[in-house]
A protein has these predicted regions:
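Extended catalytic core of nucleotide-activated donor transferases of GT-like folds
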Residues: 1-62, 79-85, 216-226
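Nucleotide-sugar donor-binding catalytic core of glycosyltransferases
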Residues: 66-67, 72-226
Length: 226
């Protein structure tokens, strides 16, 4: 008999089986957005779902989901304290500015899949993305996707909700297509501006020729180097 089952991020299949056998299921979420959280299985009483995204936590909690809890992401300080800090480490990693993360510029990313959409809809989506980049503290991407716009996107890149899911196409398109494009634009613009004045190192998977003054170091090992 197991005392509990633990996973990083949430699995509907694990929750279903834990619920069947009355075993507590603890899931620690580190991705946002995470589509599996819109499975109806998150209401299973066996669940203890810990989210670091306070906005998503409140959205679910205020929606009557009582199996979610807010918890900031943790760090193993003991492991970090054991990492050596010598001259070689400083030579490799020191920089005025460093950024670790995806630039969302992988070939065939979600927004690129809309390249064959009508000029009107493409112009509308580009304008929405541009507007969102200039407004902080409010995310309106999902609100401005009208049924006609959703229909046009569906014709190019259809989306069918999971059988156990309650997510809407507007949620998926707003958060996985448009929001990622907003993030991509912002990261390129910020790194371009910063690298004009400071030594800037970028740790990411893909080349960034659009940022000639940024030192792209490729991916970094999260365990050995961070």
């Amino acid at each position: 008999h197991y005392d509990a089952v633990f996973s990083f991020n949430y699995s509907a299949a694990v929750s279903t089986n834990c619920n069947r056998h009355n075993i507590p299921y603890i899931s620690w979420i580190y991705d946002s957005p995470l589509l599996t959280l819109y499975s109806y299985t998150i209401t299973n009483p066996c669940n203890y779902i810990f989210l670091f995204d306070s906005e998503q936590y409140l959205q679910l909690k205020n929606g009557g989901i009582n199996t979610v809890y807010y918890m900031p992401l943790a760090v193993n300080t003991a492991r970090l304290d054991r990492m050596p800090m010598n001259t070689m480490v400083h030579q490799v990693f020191d920089s005025d500015v460093s950024f670790v993360g995806s630039m969302y510029n992988e070939k065939g990313n979600f927004y690129e899949r809309l390249e064959n959409i009508s000029p009107y809809v493409k112009g509308y989506l580009d304008a929405v993305i541009n507007a969102q980049q200039h407004i902080y503290g409010a995310n309106f991407l999902e609100d401005v996707l009208s049924p006609d716009i959703i229909k046009a996107i569906q014709e190019i890149t259809p989306y069918t909700p999971n059988k156990d899911g309650i997510e809407t196409p507007s949620y998926v398109y707003a958060n996985y297509f448009l929001a990622r494009k907003v993030t991509q634009n912002e990261r390129f613009e910020i790194l371009k501006a910063v690298s004009d004045h400071f030594t800037t190192k970028l740790y990411t998977h893909n080349p960034t020729p659009e940022l000639p003054d940024v030192i792209n170091k490729g991916p970094i090992d999260f365990y050995d180097n961070m």
